[in-house]
Amino acid sequence: TAYLESNRDENGVWDGKGLRPEQIQGFGLGVMNARAAYFAKRDPRLASFLTEGRSFGPHGTGLFIANSIDHYDEALSQELTQLTVTANLKMREIGFKPYVAPALSSGALSLLLTLRGAWHCGSVFLDGVFMGVKNRYTPAGVETELLPRIPDPLFGHIREAAEHLKSVL
């Protein structure tokens, strides 16, 4: 939204005079990654996420949590994704609207990592959409993590997320 709206004139017509895509980063993936880690710490079956896992996609629809890149398990990844996506809804069901934890994991901590040039989860402009991936800022610009191999089923989920994001623009 920041990118699109900043590049429209007062009549809503695209003028390209606003923010450049590389000037924007979304930090919603940070909170989702932290939620996945929460569940991985409590279930030995999901523990591989803590050292080998990754989060991909947007903060909402299309988010996918991989239990591991090297030892990818579709069923475990689906389970971890579902737990992560529904965690916020469960908190709201019991009467809490989470503010502090997301503000720290998605905002403050991710922003500090960004400013330090450290690896973190965030949405950066890739192939015409803001896609959540592990990335960092360097003097040359944003660097996204290059994985030597992405399991085909996982790549399919990432592709689906990107196509979904393109469809809502």
PLM features per residue range, with description:
Residues 1-72:
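Rossmann-fold dinucleotide-binding core
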Residues 42-169:
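Long, compositionally biased stretches enriched for glycine and/or charged residues
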